[in-house]
Amino acid sequence: MVLAAPLLLGFLLLALELRPRGEAAEGPAAAAAAAAAAAAAGVGGERSSRPAPSVAPEPDGCPVCVWRQHSRELRLESIKSQILSKLRLKEAPNISREVVKQLLPKAPPLQQILDLHDFQGDALQPEDFLEEDEYHATTETVISMAQETDPAVQTDGSPLCCHFHFSPKVMFTKVLKAQLWVYLRPVPRPATVYLQILRLKPLTGEGTAGGGGGGRRHIRIRSLKIELHSRSGHWQSIDFKQVLHSWFRQPQSNWGIEINAFDPSGTDLAVTSLGPGAEGLHPFMELRVLENTKRSRRNLGLDCDEHSSESRCCRYPLTVDFEAFGWDWIIAPKRYKANYCSGQCEYMFMQKYPHTHLVQQANPRGSAGPCCTPTKMSPINMLYFNDKQQIIYGKIPGMVVDRCGCS
């Protein structure tokens, strides 16, 4: 004990030397620790008969319930920021609920996506899932709405439809499937309809508006014969993968297309303009794409509830409601279970070196201790409008807390 006392005092002095600059030379915790060490060792080799002064307890901070509420609020703000960042959006798209109703196509592909995937946010994820990387969202399905054509391909203001815009990210993916969807108006009686799709090109040479001859403005790329028997309208899909490949290889060749569907009387049944009653019936392109992915494994952690008295690090339930955010641009899910971490993390083991342990004991607030944080997270599926009013279906990684731990 006599030999150990100077060594203990030496470690304590070293700990005080290692304190961060700018702190007071005599903090309450350091003074108490020094007094305790001096009392145990005996300053100058003499034992003290006086008892060591008691150490005043440090403030506990917020009550558990207040701390949890603070953790919830931070988690919600973090989720909003992460979604925009992972979708590569600088800000939330300015799309109101009324605009969503107008743009949302009333078509089979969209309903199939909603039916195929659970968008309630409470279904169990598979044990294994694929991710593009650890951060950015993975695109699986892209729905591009028809837009107005460039004036360079119009004559006397027509045709106004249809041009499809694709981002560079989509053009560098592998296209597994590409379909053009066109809505045909109902017919009073069974009829044969001749649908044709023409590729548009700018007028060249003398082939300008009002001129004669010159370059061809229309190039037929697809022609279909369709038998209509329904009186309630019909969604017709056309394989467009080959055309899309040529557009992606040569983006400058994408000037849009013109769609016609004539019945025997010469009436064009294809809906290509947003007139009264045509909301959600505009042509659109559906793409299934494949991005590079890698395998990751999901592992659940310990759960607590809001009424739990547990003070240690634990996972708590948290439901994110996008409608409460005013984010109408997210089609599905409208809400999902995100969860959050909260609780205390204690030093479970003594540090590797004695002087490190003494530093932590002498100045616990100046030491970087373990924090309660997510140690495992999983993705969510999302169907949303981007800033170009295109409908995107993809997977956003790291949005559900599966496990919490001290790290």
From Swiss-Prot:
Record site: Cleavage: G121, D122, R298
Major subcellular location class: secreted
Subcellular location: Secreted
GO terms of molecular function: cytokine activity; growth factor activity
SMART domains, A to Z: TGFB (SM00204)
Signal peptide: 1-24
Disulphide bridges: C304-C314, C313-C372, C341-C404, C345-C406
Subunit structure: Homodimer; disulfide-linked. Interacts directly with ACVR2B. Interacts directly with ACVR2A. Interacts with ACVR1B, TGFBR1 and ACVR1C in an ACVR2B-dependent manner. Interacts with FST isoform 2/FS-288.
Family (UniProt): Belongs to the TGF-beta family.
Name of the protein in its database record: Growth/differentiation factor 11
Organism: Homo sapiens (Human)
Protein encoded by which gene: GDF11
